[in-house]
Swiss-Prot record:
HAMAP family: HypA_HybF (MF_00213). It comes from Shewanella baltica (strain OS223). Signal peptide: none annotated. Ni(2+) binds at H2. GO terms for biological process: protein maturation; protein modification process. Zn(2+) binds at C73, C76, C89, C92. InterPro entries: HypA/HybF (IPR000688). Involved in the maturation of [NiFe] hydrogenases. Required for nickel insertion into the metal center of the hydrogenase. Belongs to the HypA/HybF family. GO terms for molecular function: nickel cation binding; zinc ion binding. This is Hydrogenase maturation factor HypA. Keywords: Metal-binding, Nickel, Zinc.
Amino acid sequence: MHEYSIVSALIEQCEQHALANHAAKITRVDIKLGVMSGVEPSLLQTAFDTFKLDGICNAAQLNIQIQPLVILCQDCQSESVLSERTIVCPACQSYRTRVLDGEDMLLMQLEMEQEED
């Protein structure tokens, strides 16, 4: 399950941001997850809940925003937003499409609490 390595990298990135901002803890992690990212949201959530226990994210809530697939048809120039995993143009049924969005996983926002002086 590659979600474990993804969550490990995500938590490491969160820790770097917390350190740079002198945060004592992270309370919320917002990510955007593309439908074509190859990451299963429920497995990602489970992995996050497991890995967060020993670090600065131990009280953090993970919010996952699913990013639909956005494609551009090379034949009819139609741009389409799709909620399923297909690269077929819904306008002309062409397979000659280019993915514009929906393949990535991005850290969008962190909510942190500052260290007290």
